């Protein structure tokens, strides 16, 4: 993966890789920068040593209104620095990106599996990977299998 970062001129301060659901052939790759993350997927069967990355901003500035929020401090520690923040209607959503995206190999804009509502904590009754298999259907499974094959 480091060779791919170098070849594709992807800057990073840290990175991690983890397998996607149900297999060990397609890997979720995240390269952190000071302002966000380059995210991509790499199959062991890819013919080219290339990863199609997309960039997601961390959006730290959105946290200013809730910096003293006790849950936020716990989430920052828990995420080990791998998070994004986004505004959804009237609330801020904290995404721990280490757990991946719901069918991210099919849709680069897919939601993250672990997310937490910062301004509506009562909606966080069950937050651990609440969306791991959300949005899965036969098409998502077909795309996963094709992507594993290196297509």
PLM regions: where:
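Alpha-helical transmembrane signal-anchor/signal-peptide segments
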Residues: 1-13
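Extracytosolic and intramembrane catalytic regions of membrane-associated proteins
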Residues: 13-14, 21-151
């Amino acid at each position: 993966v480091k060779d791919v970062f170098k070849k594709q001129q992807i800057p990073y301060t840290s990175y991690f890789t983890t397998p996607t659901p149900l297999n060990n052939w397609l890997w979720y790759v995240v390269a952190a920068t000071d302002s966000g993350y380059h995210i991509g997927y790499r199959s062991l069967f890819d013919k080219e040593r290339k990863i199609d990355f997309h960039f997601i901003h961390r959006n730290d500035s959105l946290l200013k209104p809730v910096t003293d929020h006790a849950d936020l401090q716990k989430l920052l520690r828990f995420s080990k620095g791998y998070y994004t923040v986004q505004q959804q209607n009237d609330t801020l959503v904290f995404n721990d990106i280490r757990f991946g995206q719901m069918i991210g190999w099919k849709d680069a804009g897919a939601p993250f599996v672990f997310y937490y509502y910062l301004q509506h904590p009562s909606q966080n009754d069950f937050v651990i990977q609440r969306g791991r298999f959300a949005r899965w259907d036969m098409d998502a499974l077909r795309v996963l299998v094709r992507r594993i094959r290196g297509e």
